[in-house]
Amino acid sequence: MKTYNDLYLNTRNMLKRSGVEAYAQEARILVACAADKTVTQLLRDLNLYTTPAVENTVTDYLARRLRGEPVAYITGTWEFYGLPMKVNADVLIPRPDTETLVDAVKEVLVGYKMDARVLDLCCGSGCITCAVGHELPATKLVAVDLSASALEICRANIAMNRLSSRVICMQADATASPPLGIGTFDVIASNPPYVKSGEIQTLDRSVRDYEPIWALDGGKDGLRFYKAIIKYWKSLLRPEGALIFEVGENQADDVCDMLMAAGFASCAVRKDARGVERVVIGRI
C-alpha cells in the first residue's frame, strides 16, 4: 500500500515528464481532490497510507490531465479572488488576469458609491459577480449570460458564496438590446470573448480542446463583443457610471478609441500582474 507522499511523487513525476509547467502544484491538487482533502490536509497527511479507491481515482485524474484536460475541470473547483468557484466545461476557468477587473471595479466604487448597482455582463461562472459581491458587501448585482448552462454554474457559485440575496441572474445576449426592466447601473463590468476567430486553433490544447469556444471567440478582429456592448448597453449606465472591460493583449487602445468615439468622457487602462494592459475603464 502506498502513502500519500508516494502517490504525490508519482503524480508529480508523471506530470513533469509530460511537460506540465506547474507539475508540483497540480499533483498536490489532484491527489488532494482524489482523497477529499484540502492541499493543507494532504501535506499534513503525506506519511499516512492511502486506499485503493484513492489510488484508482488519482490514476483516472492523471490520465485525464495527460490528455490535456485542465485541472480545474477534473476537480470541478477553482479559486478566484480567494473564493471557491465551481467550474465545468460550460464555463471558462477563472484566470488571475481577471482579478485586475475586480480591482478596477473596487477602484471605481470604494469611497464613492459603496451601495452601487453592478452588472456583470458575459458572467460565465459568476467569478466577477462573487468577487465584487464579497469585496463590496453593500452592492446589488445582476449577472447576465446567454448560456443557460453557464448560468446554472453561476447560480451555484452565488449560493456557495452566500450572495443569493443580493444577486439576480438573467439570460440575455450581450450583442443585442438589453432585456426590458433590467434597470440602470453604476458599473457595467464585462470579460467578453476577445480571441480573434482565426487564432482559436493556436491556443494551448487545454484551452482549445476543453474550454467553451463560444466564450472565447470574439469574431474576426476580436472586438465584436466590445462594439456591441458599447452600442447596446451604454444607455444603462447612470450618471458618472463606468463601463469596465477586460481586454486581450494589444486591444486596450482599440477599445479606448471605441469608448471615446461613443461619447465617454474618459478612458483609463490598468495593467495585470504580468504588466499586460488588461482592463479598460470608460467613464460617462
Residue ranges and their predicted role:
Residues 1-43, 47-50:
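Non-catalytic accessory regions of SAM-dependent methyltransferases
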Residues 15, 109, 158, 233, ...:
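Conserved hydrophobic residues forming the short capping helix/wall of the S-adenosyl-L-methionine
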Residues 32-108:
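Conserved AdoMet
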Residues 72, 195-198, 250:
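Active-site beta-alpha loop architecture of Rossmann-like, nucleotide-cofactor-dependent enzymes
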Residues 97-202, 227-228:
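Conserved SAM/SAH cofactor-binding pocket of Class I
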Residues 194, 283-284:
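C-terminal beta-strand of the catalytic ATP-binding
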Residues 194-224:
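Mobile active-site "lid"/loop adjacent to the S-adenosyl-L-methionine
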Residues 220-283:
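Conserved Class I SAM-dependent methyltransferase catalytic core
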